[in-house]
Amino acid sequence: MQSWSAPAIPVVPGRGPALRLFDSADRQVRPVTPGPTATMYVCGITPYDATHLGHAATYLTFDLVHRLWLDAGHTVQYVQNVTDVDDPLFERAERDGIDWRTLGDRETQLFREDMAALRVLPPHDYVAATDAIAEVVEMVEKLLASGAAYIVEDAEYPDVYFRADATAQFGYESGYDRDTMLTLFAERGGDPDRPGKSDQLDALLWRAERPGEPSWPSPFGRGRPGWHVECSAIALTRIGTGLDIQGGGSDLIFPHHEYSAAHAESVTGERRFARHYVHTGMIGWDGHKMSKSRGNLVLVSQLRAQGVDPSAIRLGLFSGHYREDRFWSNEVLDEANARLARWRSATALPEAPDATDVIARVRQYLADDLDTPKALAALDGWCTDALSYGGHDTESPRLVATTVDALLGVDL
């Protein structure tokens, strides 16, 4: 599947420090320790509606990771999926009287356009779930053969389920107790009360064919993949074991990332699917989490149509820490536009203060769990000094603009 065009990335003199990130499984900030090639899997969209700022905040966060790895001298293998076969897509297509494939293609293309406009570096592999059916089938076969999965006794719909107790470590990624798991499982696409399951927390691997739904052949009957196993299969076949980062929004901690990890660990025997599980906070509007179901979305495409500079969108989202739940507002956008204007004015000066210290601090702040508020404040200080007092360094305006472009993805 085609992704989107990559923006040019300038090179900042020197090399960035090693990255440290909060790991949701270990509940602490600790070093990320990739080899020469850093690997990252980030869960992609279910394309039944346009890209909102909650999506943008997540993909901008991992764009920072991508950029910082490049700045530190790594090659990056980044994989992202598209969940182009799932219940929300079918429901929206039926509501709108459109074929689900047409809807998925349309919204995926809009997502590509939004990501390109936001100057997000594209993934190395951009994989639709419908292009990974063979990998999913193979993985489900292995899980069935090992006893980690079973087929429910249902003559009409013999679905395949994963045993939540298939791995001794199940639950380590989220750290949630069983009651919390059951609540979130029911709220986020699970089916705890499905008759025939061995345990309420057993998760769907393969949904047997239903009338009006797409299906594919498999040794265990026609059907379609469950949500979690798509990501497990795509990540293992594109990257393999020892994934450096599994990433997504905090609403994916459970059940999605817990089960994706458990599926992969059951197949490979590895203790941990990913070395780091990294999650972004939710973006709200009008006092509530921004979500399609609530209908309070601020769409990237709408902001672009209104003439909002994509660099201002980046700065607005970077004004808060990536792990925090935070709110978007007109005030946030106004502040981002003002900051962008100041930075552009300062970096357009013929001379300015020396930039060595500010570049080092920006690198250090970003490497320390993506502390964008401190990085932005450091740049604000340099720009204020440049505009208020001037300087004598003819290279520093260009170097600061290069740093902002390369590390923050903001075009000055």
Swiss-Prot record:
Cofactor(s) named in the record: Zn(2+)
Q: What does the Swiss-Prot or TrEMBL cofactor note state?
A: Binds 1 zinc ion per subunit.
Give residue numbers for sequence motif 'KMSKS' region: 289-293
Per the Swiss-Prot or TrEMBL record, what residue ranges does the short sequence motif 'ERGGDP' region cover?
Answer: 187-192
Instruction: Tell me which Gene3D superfamilies the record gives.
Output: Anticodon-binding domain of a subclass of class I aminoacyl-tRNA synthetases, HUPs
A GO-annotated cellular component: cytosol
- A Pfam family it matches: tRNA-synt_1e
Recorded E.C. number(s)? 6.3.1.13
Outline the subunit composition.
Monomer.
Query: Which protein, by its recorded name, is this?
Result: L-cysteine:1D-myo-inositol 2-amino-2-deoxy-alpha-D-glucopyranoside ligase
Q: Give the species.
A: Mycolicibacterium smegmatis (strain ATCC 700084 / mc(2)155) (Mycobacterium smegmatis)
Q: What is the lineage of its organism?
A: Bacteria, Bacillati, Actinomycetota, Actinomycetes, Mycobacteriales
